[in-house]
Regions:
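N-terminal cap/lid segment of alpha/beta-hydrolase-fold proteins
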Residues: 21-54
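Mobile cap/lid helix-loop segments that gate and shape the active-site cleft of serine hydrolases
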Residues: 37, 153-155, 181, 185-221, ...
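Short substrate-entry loop that stabilizes the transition state in hydrolases
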Residues: 52-56, 65-107
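Alpha/beta-hydrolase active-site loop
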Residues: 106-126
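Primarily recognizes the serine-hydrolase "nucleophile elbow" in alpha/beta-hydrolase
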Residues: 120-190
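Short beta-strand/loop motif that positions the catalytic acidic residue
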Residues: 225, 231-233, 237
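Conserved alpha/beta-hydrolase "acid-adjacent" motif
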Residues: 238-247
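Catalytic active-site module of serine/aspartate enzymes centered on a nucleophile-bearing elbow/loop
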Residues: 278-298
Length: 298
């Protein structure tokens, strides 16, 4: 049952920081089409907290997979993302996890077009989902981190990435959780695997001096007025170099924007761990993330 999966998957329990929340269960509406750019219907899974009359803040979840693989299903998310999703619903958030067009069948910028269209769809249908259109947060990991960060930093600019659907709605986000995101696509130091996978979407490998990669890099769009960022990265990540997150934090702060970086010891890509426990522990980090979202939006 989807309700049970959302509430217990990953960490085995709602993170302690939000265990006492007013919302103890969720209803799930699956296979909801949000956009159909390029003639391809894209769906999202919406999880709504039960109880309470107030409008809910929204957490948009965008999966990773080097723009080529992945799925909106809870079971396909990292253990950390699953824990944040369950904690967010327990804390009163509506959570929307999206699919988007994947490479190589769909080249860039299909992925950012779909992500931005999802934000606009959710604002257009805010009444249906009982969500506050002024309290939109997004969490993405790896390529998903690139997508949510790029949307947040380009906001109403870069209209070439806008679908014709829901054209009157804003793509703005009020908070971003960037988890080990790919934020500087032109930087050196990528693994052979990463360079190879990226060609599926961009036709050129990461690290190339390409105008397309530069435009797709969130760091190219940093400026004053960005929403608050919580950036999380495992220090043992060999697929996305941790300095990607350090660079983003530095640039955001230099522009006068709020940015917090959490560097997780003994954790690789996706916060994968070995025999040595990660620090902070996953359940603690998930609870802290939900608390940050609450403090930032409320």
């Amino acid at each position: 049952m989807l309700v049970a999966v959302l509430l217990i998957a990953g960490s085995g329990a709602v993170p302690s920081a939000v265990a006492a929340g007013a919302y103890e269960a969720a209803s799930a509406s699956t296979t909801v089409t949000y956009c159909s750019d390029g003639g391809q219907a894209q769906t999202l899974d919406m999880y709504e907290p039960l109880g309470g009359a107030a409008l809910h803040p929204l957490l948009l979840v965008v999966h990773g997979g080097y723009w080529s693989v992945g799925d909106s299903a809870v079971s396909q998310q990292s253990q950390f993302t699953q824990a944040v999703m369950s904690g967010a619903v327990a804390a009163g958030f509506a959570v929307a996890s999206i699919n988007y067009r994947l490479a190589p069948a769909n080249r860039w910028p299909a992925q950012i077009i779909d992500t931005r269209c999802a934000v606009r769809y959710l604002r257009a249908t805010a009444t249906r989902w009982h969500i506050d259109p002024h309290e939109f947060a997004a969490l993405g990991d790896s390529a998903g981190g690139q997508l949510v960060s790029l949307d947040a930093l380009s906001a109403q600019r870069e209209q070439q990435w806008d679908s014709a659907q829901y054209a009157g709605q804003s793509t703005a986000l009020q908070a971003v959780v960037d988890c080990w995101g790919i934020v500087d696509l032109t930087a050196p130091g990528w693994s052979r695997l990463g360079r190879g996978l990226s060609t599926n979407a961009f036709r050129v490998p990461l690290g190339s001096p390409s105008a397309v990669l530069r435009s797709a890099s969130p760091v190219s769009h940093v400026g004053p007025g960005a929403p608050p960022f919580l950036i999380i990265h495992g220090l043992s990540d060999t697929l996305v170099p941790p300095r990607q997150s350090t660079e983003l934090r530095t640039l955001l702060r230099a522009a006068g924007d709020a940015a917090t970086l959490v560097e997780v010891a003994n954790a690789g890509h996706g916060l994968a761990t070995t025999a040595v426990p990660m620090v902070p522990a996953l359940s603690d980090l998930a609870g802290q993330t939900v608390s940050w979202l609450l403090a930032t939006l409320r």
